[in-house]
């Protein structure tokens, strides 16, 4: 997984609440096995009409908005527990999603796939939307080590919470297996010490 330490970029504002996983990636596109291929169908039914033509007023189809940070309304990622929703957002090119609340399962799936969910208070979320509406080139910075998100032009910032284990994994670019592998030497030493006390022959370790 790619390391995530800091990120400063422009923002794509999706001003909609209760965005569920079927809206993020419709069920008919879940048969694919390549994670990278899901990006093309992100918000498929909002991005394209029944003829496959782009819906011009949808935010992902507007050239004035770009960037690797998705700004979303409250209760993002609700609905079914499909991991494909996180895959689609990540495959499209987003590295972080900012909202005032995330569904728990979506939040876990996002973190497991290297996508950072940044949960802020409703008041700060409103400030973010206002800043982007005022200037679509506004940049937002996210410092994972400091657990801070900041509006660059005004300097206004807010802290956000993240599980310490998931934070370590993101900063180091680890998935669960990578994290375990990184601890093998410490595990081996612990087992050697433990087995030594129990008089277990070293060659069995």
From Swiss-Prot:
> How is this protein annotated for GO cellular component?
3-isopropylmalate dehydratase complex
Give the EC number.
4.2.1.33
Name the pathway it acts in.
Amino-acid biosynthesis; L-leucine biosynthesis; L-leucine from 3-methyl-2-oxobutanoate: step 2/4
> Which GO molecular function entries does the Swiss-Prot or TrEMBL record give?
3-isopropylmalate dehydratase activity
Is the keyword Flavoprotein in the record? no
Q: Which reaction does it catalyse?
A: (2R,3S)-3-isopropylmalate = (2S)-2-isopropylmalate
Q: Which GO terms describe its biological process?
A: L-leucine biosynthetic process
List UniProt keywords, sorted A-Z: Amino-acid biosynthesis, Branched-chain amino acid biosynthesis, Leucine biosynthesis, Lyase
The Swiss-Prot or TrEMBL record describes its family as follows: Belongs to the LeuD family. LeuD type 1 subfamily.
Function description: Catalyzes the isomerization between 2-isopropylmalate and 3-isopropylmalate, via the formation of 2-isopropylmaleate.
Quaternary structure? Heterodimer of LeuC and LeuD.
**What name is this protein filed under?**
3-isopropylmalate dehydratase small subunit
**Native source species:** Christiangramia forsetii (strain DSM 17595 / CGMCC 1.15422 / KT0803)
């Amino acid at each position: 997984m790619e390391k995530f330490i800091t990120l400063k970029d422009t923002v794509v504002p999706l001003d909609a609440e209760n965005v569920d996983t079927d809206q993020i990636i419709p069920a008919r596109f879940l048969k694919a096995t390549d994670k990278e291929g899901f990006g093309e169908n992100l918000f498929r039914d909002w991005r394209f009409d029944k003829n496959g033509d782009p819906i011009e007023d949808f935010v992902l189809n507007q050239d004035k908005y770009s960037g690797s940070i998705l700004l979303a309304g409250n209760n993002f990622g609700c609905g079914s527990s499909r991991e494909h929703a996180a895959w689609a957002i990540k495959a499209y090119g987003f590295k972080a999603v900012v909202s005032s609340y995330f569904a728990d399962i979506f939040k876990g799936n996002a973190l497991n796939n290297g996508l950072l969910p940044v949960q802020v208070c409703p008041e700060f979320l409103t400030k973010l939307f206002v800043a982007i509406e005022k200037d679509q080139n506004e940049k937002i910075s996210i410092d994972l080590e400091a657990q801070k998100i900041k509006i660059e032009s005004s300097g206004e910032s807010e802290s956000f919470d993240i599980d310490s284990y998931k934070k370590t994994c993101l900063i180091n670019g680890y998935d669960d297996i990578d994290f375990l592998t990184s601890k093998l030497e410490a595990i081996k030493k612990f087992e050697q010490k433990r087995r030594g006390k129990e008089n277990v022959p070293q060659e069995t370790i």
